[in-house]
Design a protein with these regions (language model features):
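Conserved active-site and SAM-binding loop architecture
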Residues: 1-239
């Protein structure tokens, strides 16, 4: 339909997990048990499709910082409690997300990957900044601040010896995550964003940098989803 929602559901039974990531951030933090008043209308479309399609398995993801009332509505509608998984178990990125699924999921531990492990060796000069840096302290995850914005998050410069904070769907305006390398500050490249989301190198190549940053920041961490889908093999073996 014209509003982006489905007018009717498929009549077949899907053999693969039905996946959905409803709008995050502000939309995800406001919730209602009524589709008519919910800001995140897509979630209730997801529920409708689940009931009509009746897939064997399903998976839904949203931000861990969402309001408890919204989380409870989702859990009530889906009949399962969410599992908290941080992407730091599989990548150099801290990214806590809630996953609702009827697939059994094993506990995962934080891995040893750090931001330094995903950095490119040779980076174009266009990614570097010349803004002054303050509060340089190489013992901290946020090891400096770059004086270019009034937004505290955009000022943060990350230490490559630590994990990177959560990637977000930014397009430009110096909002990209920044790293301190050899005494200089630069934004992370799109390829480094891909690696933090465990995508293949240059997976998003072919579109503008801004579009790449936005798409990658909006996406899932691939290895987290692969970890969840391992549970499908457990189900198959039991059956």
């Amino acid at each position: 339909s014209s509003d982006g929602t489905a007018s009717s559901a498929p009549t077949y039974s899907s053999p693969t997990p039905y996946r959905h990531a409803p709008p995050s951030a502000s939309k995800a933090r406001s919730c209602s048990s009524s589709p008519a008043t919910a800001k995140s209308k897509l979630f209730f479309e997801y529920v409708r499709l689940l009931r009509e399609v009746k897939p064997k398995h399903f998976l839904l993801e949203n931000v861990a910082s969402m309001k408890k009332e919204c989380k409870d509505v989702i859990s009530s509608q889906l009949g399962v409690e969410p599992i908290l998984i941080n992407s730091n178990c599989f990548s150099a990125q801290d990214r806590s997300r809630l996953y609702w699924s009827n697939i059994p999921v094993e506990h995962a531990k934080e891995c040893d990957l750090r931001l330094a492990d995903v950095l490119e060796s040779h980076v174009d000069e266009k990614y570097f900044y010349n803004y002054p840096l303050k509060d340089i302290d190489l013992s901290k995850q946020v090891c400096a601040t770059m004086e270019h914005s009034n937004n505290e998050m955009h000022k943060r410069v990350f230490n490559p010896k630590f994990k990177c904070h959560t990637l977000t769907a930014v397009c430009g305006g110096n909002q990209q995550k920044k790293v301190y390398v050899d005494g200089r500050c630069r934004k992370l490249t799109p390829l480094e964003y891909e690696r933090l989301q465990t995508l293949p190198d240059n997976y998003t190549k072919g579109i503008s940098d801004g579009a790449r940053y936005k798409a990658i920041g909006n996406g899932w961490t691939v290895d987290v989803i692969a970890h969840i889908f391992k549970g499908l093999g457990v189900i198959k073996n039991v059956a």
